């Protein structure tokens, strides 16, 4: 006992005394179970040893942590975690007749669910799950199960035949002497959930025979109708007399009412409040530092072309790079990378965002006014702009797959197919059922029942596609851009009607329009078709369509009608403000829409509603449109731009130029472009080194 100082006796268990002790090394409070081995029967000693054996196998935040065991004065001492909030049974008793909210019930229940799932995954049966063995932390928010004294480790048998446990929680099969397996723990879990909802036990009687009769007949008082039908049905399912009809733990975890509280655990439990609140870099995108469950920013670095020359001499250039230009930056500017690989980028009106290979969100923002280097009075040379890169830190377990930016709002898609949005809530583009701004990524709850595979943001609306090829849209509805047959706006996702044989693969949002690409390379479009930027005019050759064949606006998704968009296999497409670009399977590049600034890539500025094949470009793999310029990527990493050149749009010091010309990136090795995004007058482009496959020797 050199390590511990006994404080008081807090209970007497089945086999011994329970002490509250203070650990001398760090003054932490721990529980010490004192089990007098010599006075115990063989079965009792085996039970005590079993508890140690089981606790060593378990490691979970919702299970009482095991520290060590040792012998002291012929007694077995087990040191374990102290839960100061008391038992769940005490908590329920103190409620008197004041029923708990359903959210509170589910918050506690899913923690027990996760703990039991961990136990069963270790091939262990708890066999004595009850509210007296479920403990709470000091805030009574975190639930931990304990008391594994009569647990059973399943080595080779799949069932345990001994009848143990508290009578009120014993399952019907145990009353009949049938084997005990995981489904008996499910019954006990159902009893605990019933107790949380009713503040009383499901099965109680004056004597054991009467109790067994109630259990065998499945007779218990109905649950209050203040709770949802889903919760009441879940309890009924878990308390089914037939063990085979009780749900498995993973089925319960997948239940509709459990998904949200389970997700909340991973975003809320264990968060640390920050006392010092940093000034955000922008009004919308900065995370709510110090707010529970929020995303915080960290790891600042600065980068810019002004220091590029000196850094070359000291350190080799990074293998993975992200470049930006536009808004006054006339040549590609390498952004600080935080020593990571960015695999996808997106641009909004004010946001520059990326996703790293490890599934983290990274953002680049200009420093706030006054935070840069001071300039000398009378200086005329303009400093190259600098950017600060930050990781947007979520809670553990969240891996971001892709990001898409709108005007002042952002959507991100996780590897589990869940969409989260944050930023400005105007026009309902966050999809949360309201128009409120959200400064931390928040799950779009209406889509939790679907697995999303891709999402796209326009200026003020969003489209998303599921793994079942369904499409949802929400946000601003002007011009029919949502494809819902009206111009109404929606602040909650709405399912889009698609042709019966159309299998959606990719969605794309423009400023005031939308497109959907199918697995068969068909294209649907809706919204504003000004200048035929969606290809909805009936065009069969090189002649301009008659006014009868011209389409200005559609409110439902329709197949594109302009050749060759409706005849060639289109593999990549992007929409700008007034024009669009498409890439065929053969690597050809077609532009269509306005040509006011030469953004269609032809030598003249004449307006035409006929798609134009950009000459001189071959092997194009991807392309993008800004407000009045176009960008294309070649198979070997070549970057071409054309159109309006003001304020650095083209990545070179030229004004409007209607013929594609290359953009020079500061790369000393061969590279490929992994992702590109254009928005308004800006471009964001990610590259990685290109390594040739070694040939046969």
Curated annotation (Swiss-Prot):
Cellular component annotations (GO), alphabetically ordered: centrosome; cilium; cytoplasm
Enzyme class: transferase
Matching InterPro entries: Kinase-like_dom_sf (IPR011009), Prot_kinase_dom (IPR000719), Protein_kinase_ATP_BS (IPR017441), RCC1/BLIP-II (IPR009091), Reg_chr_condens (IPR000408), Ser/Thr_kinase_AS (IPR008271), STK_NEK (IPR051997), STKc_Nek8 (IPR044120)
GO BP annotations listed: animal organ morphogenesis; cell division; determination of heart left/right asymmetry; heart looping; pronephros development; pronephros formation; renal tubule development
Domain Protein kinase: 4-263
Post-translational modification Phosphothreonine, affected residues: 162
UniProt catalytic activity: L-seryl-[protein] + ATP = O-phospho-L-seryl-[protein] + ADP + H(+); L-threonyl-[protein] + ATP = O-phospho-L-threonyl-[protein] + ADP + H(+)
EC code: 2.7.11.1
The protein's name in its UniProt record: Serine/threonine-protein kinase Nek8
Family membership noted in the UniProt record: Belongs to the protein kinase superfamily. NEK Ser/Thr protein kinase family. NIMA subfamily.
Disulfide pattern: none
Nucleotide-binding as UniProt keyword: yes
Binding annotation for ATP: 10-18, 33
Gene name tied to this protein: nek8
Catalytic residue positions: 128
Subcellular location: Cytoplasm; Cytoplasm, Cytoskeleton; Cell projection, Cilium; Cytoplasm, Cytoskeleton, Cilium axoneme
């Amino acid at each position: 006992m050199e390590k511990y100082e006994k404080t008081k006796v807090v209970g007497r268990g089945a086999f011994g005394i329970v002490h509250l002790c203070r650990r001398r090394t760090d003054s932490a409070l721990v529980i010490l179970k004192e089990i007098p081995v010599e006075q115990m029967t063989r079965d009792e000693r085996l039970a005590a040893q079993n508890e140690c054996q089981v606790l060593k196998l378990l490691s979970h935040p919702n299970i009482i942590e095991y520290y060590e065991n040792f012998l002291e004065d012929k007694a077995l001492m087990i040191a374990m975690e102290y839960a100061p909030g008391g038992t769940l049974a005490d908590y329920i008793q103190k409620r008197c007749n004041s029923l708990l909210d359903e959210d509170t019930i589910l918050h506690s229940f899913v923690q027990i669910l996760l703990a039991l799932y961990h136990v069963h995954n270790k091939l262990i049966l708890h066999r004595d799950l009850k509210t007296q063995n479920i403990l709470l932390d000091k805030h009574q928010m975190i639930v931990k199960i304990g008391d594994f004294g009569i647990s059973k480790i399943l080595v080779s048998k799949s069932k345990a035949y001994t009848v143990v446990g508290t009578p009120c929680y014993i399952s019907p099969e145990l009353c009949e002497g049938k084997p005990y397996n995981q489904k008996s723990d499910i019954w006990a879990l159902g009893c605990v959930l019933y107790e949380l909802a009713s503040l009383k036990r499901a099965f109680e009687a004056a004597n054991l025979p009467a109790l067994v009769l109630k259990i065998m007949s499945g007779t218990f008082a109905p649950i209050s109708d203040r709770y949802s039908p889903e919760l009441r049905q879940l309890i009924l399912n878990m308390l089914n007399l037939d063990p085979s009809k009780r749900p498995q733990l993973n089925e319960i975890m997948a239940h509709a009412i459990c998904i949200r509280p389970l997700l909340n655990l991973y975003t809320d439990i264990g968060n640390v409040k920050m006392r010092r609140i940093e000034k955000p870099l922008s009004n919308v995108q900065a995370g709510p530092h110090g707010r529970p469950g929020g995303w915080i920013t960290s790891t600042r670095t600065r980068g810019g072309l002004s220091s590029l020359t000196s850094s070359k001499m000291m350190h080799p250039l990074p293998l993975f790079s992200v470049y930006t230009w536009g808004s006054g930056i006339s040549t590609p500017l390498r952004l600080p990378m935080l020593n990571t690989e960015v695999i996808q980028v997106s641009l909004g009106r004010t946001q520059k965002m990326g996703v790293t290979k490890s599934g983290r969100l990274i953002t680049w923002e200009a420093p706030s006014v006054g935070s840069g280097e001071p300039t000398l009075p009378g200086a005329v040379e303009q400093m190259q702009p600098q950017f600060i890169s930050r990781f947007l830190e979520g809670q553990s377990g969240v891996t971001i797959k892709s990001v898409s930016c709108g005007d002042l709002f952002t959507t991100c898609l996780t590897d589990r197919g869940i969409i989260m949005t944050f930023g400005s809530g105007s026009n309902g583009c966050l999809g949360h059922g309201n128009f409120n701004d959200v400064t931390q990524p928040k799950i779009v709850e209406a889509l939790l029942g679907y697995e999303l595979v891709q999402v796209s943001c326009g200026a003020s609306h969003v489209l998303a596609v599921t793994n079942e090829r369904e499409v949802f849209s929400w946000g601003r509805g002007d011009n029919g851009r949502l494809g819902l047959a009206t111009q109404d706006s929606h602040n909650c996702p709405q399912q889009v009607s698609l042709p019966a044989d159309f299998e959606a693969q990719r969605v794309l949002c423009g400023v005031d329009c939308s497109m959907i690409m199918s697995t068969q390379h068909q294209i649907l479009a809706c919204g504003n078709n000004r200048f035929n930027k969606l290809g909805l005019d009936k065009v069969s050759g090189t002649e301009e369509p008659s006014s009868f064949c011209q389409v200005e606006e559609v409110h439902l998704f329709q197949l594109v009608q302009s050749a060759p968009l409706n005849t060639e296999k289109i593999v990549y497409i992007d929409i700008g403000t007034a024009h669009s670009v498409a890439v065929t399977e053969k690597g050809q590049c077609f532009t269509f829409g306005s040509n006011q600034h030469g953004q269609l890539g032809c030598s003249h500025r004449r307006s035409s509603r006929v798609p134009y094949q950009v000459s001189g470009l071959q092997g194009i793999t991807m392309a993008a449109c800004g407000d009045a310029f176009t960008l294309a990527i070649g198979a070997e990493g070549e970057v071409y731009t054309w159109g309006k050149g003001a304020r650095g749009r083209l990545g070179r010091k030229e004004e409007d130029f209607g013929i594609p010309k290359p953009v020079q990136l500061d790369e000393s090795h061969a590279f490929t472009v992994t992702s590109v995004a254009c928005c308004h007058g800006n471009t964001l482009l990610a590259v990685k080194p290109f390594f040739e496959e070694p040939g046969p020797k």
